[in-house]
């Protein structure tokens, strides 16, 4: 999914989902994103922030947001292996950890709890939900607080990208799923 958010002077946000058709968002393939790049560049020139939201039936793509360098290094030292690392603004990082869904009735809850746990430990403790947008690399972070004296904004930088799943996050996901199953069994009694 590609989302464009225009920040209004009064603090309000105007949101536009590029892949929404007939009220449904299905996401874009990498090829479709490439085809839509001219439109995305036009939106940026109009002052809009661009975000990607990875969507998958088979995997969770967990965003860990608002990390400084120390938290990012600790995340990696602790054994987590992000598929993507972005520098969303100078000294501020986002990581995306990919984990296969387990195919149980609790997949949504497992993803949400995994996101909560990782963000409480390493990122933004207020971030919730497994499906969450991250800044689009190669585009500007147009938050007013990041505007430079010359009127420009920092570009979101892609520091790392590889097709990988995180074994440590999968272990945590399995543990959370087992807890969900125990709770469901207890409630059923």
Model-derived segments and their meaning:
Residues 2-8, 115-121, 126, 130, ...:
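A broadly tuned "polar low-complexity/structure-edge" signature
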Residues 1-93, 98-116, 120, 182-183, ...:
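Signature for HUH/AEP ssDNA processing cores
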Residues 20-21, 148-189:
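Long, charge-rich alpha-helical interaction segments
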Residues 97-103, 125-150:
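Short, conserved secondary-structure transition motifs
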Residues 69, 141, 163:
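Short, glycine-/Ser/Thr-/acidic-enriched flexible segments
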């Amino acid at each position: 999914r590609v989302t464009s958010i225009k920040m209004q002077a009064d603090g309000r946000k105007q949101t536009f989902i590029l892949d929404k058709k007939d009220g449904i968002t299905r996401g874009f393939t990498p090829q479709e994103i490439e085809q839509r790049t001219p439109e995305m560049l036009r939106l940026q020139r109009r002052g809009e922030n661009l975000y990607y939201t990875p969507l998958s039936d088979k995997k969770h793509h967990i965003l860990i947001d608002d990390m400084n360098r120390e938290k990012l290094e600790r995340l990696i030292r602790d054994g987590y292996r992000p598929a993507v690392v972005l520098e969303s603004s100078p000294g501020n990082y986002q990581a995306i950890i990919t984990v296969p869904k387990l195919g149980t009735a609790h997949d949504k809850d497992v993803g949400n709890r995994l996101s909560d746990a990782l963000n409480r430990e390493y990122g933004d403790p207020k971030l919730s939900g497994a499906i969450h947008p991250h800044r689009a690399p190669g585009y500007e972070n147009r938050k007013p607080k990041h505007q430079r004296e010359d009127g420009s904004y920092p570009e979101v930088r892609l520091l790392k990208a590889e097709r990988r799943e995180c074994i440590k996050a999968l272990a945590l996901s399995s543990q959370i799923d087992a807890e969900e199953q125990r709770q469901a069994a207890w409630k059923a009694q």
